[in-house]
């Protein structure tokens, strides 16, 4: 009985861990949220650390939780209106540098959610890097998390 409990607890810890290392790329502090239970879109945020001697570039993202998953950012137009746009050129992660995907800035956008985001739900996501290749990460939904904007 104790062994079964330990295995279950350890498996849960691994699944809920917000830290993933894939070679020289380290993902930490990953979480996702949406505007509410009826939202058709959601977003994910995280820290990406590049421990290699050369810059890499996050060039894409994929998840089965939504019809479409993209890298997005917010831009202000000439009239001062802020709008969300897809990042086509990818996101550079400098050598030995950390880059944050944050609310109000660069982030992962899930459009056409296939199911509601509920706190505690695990979302499997694949990040695609030019050099590091595919990096799988399990992102935990945290609807209650509310952080201030970070600058890049």
Where are these regions (language model features)?
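Positively charged n-region of N-terminal signal peptides that target proteins for export
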Residues: 1-5
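Bacterial N-terminal signal peptides
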Residues: 8-18
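Compact, glycine-rich, soluble single-domain proteins
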Residues: 24-152
């Amino acid at each position: 009985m104790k062994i079964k409990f330990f295995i279950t607890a350890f498996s849960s810890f691994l699944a809920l861990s917000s830290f993933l290392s894939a070679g020289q790329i380290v993902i930490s502090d990953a979480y996702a949220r949406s505007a509410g239970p009826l939202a058709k879109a959601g977003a994910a945020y995280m820290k990406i650390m590049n421990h290699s001697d050369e810059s890499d570039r996050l060039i894409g993202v994929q998840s089965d939780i939504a019809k479409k998953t993209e890298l997005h950012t917010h831009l202000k137009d000439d009239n001062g209106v802020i709008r969300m746009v897809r990042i086509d050129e990818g996101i550079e992660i400098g050598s030995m540098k950390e880059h944050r995907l944050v609310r109000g800035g660069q982030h992962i956008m899930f459009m056409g959610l296939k199911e509601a985001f509920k706190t505690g739900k695990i979302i499997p996501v694949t990040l695609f890097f030019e050099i590091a290749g595919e990096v799988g990460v399990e992102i935990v939904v945290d609807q209650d998390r509310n952080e201030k904007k970070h600058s890049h």
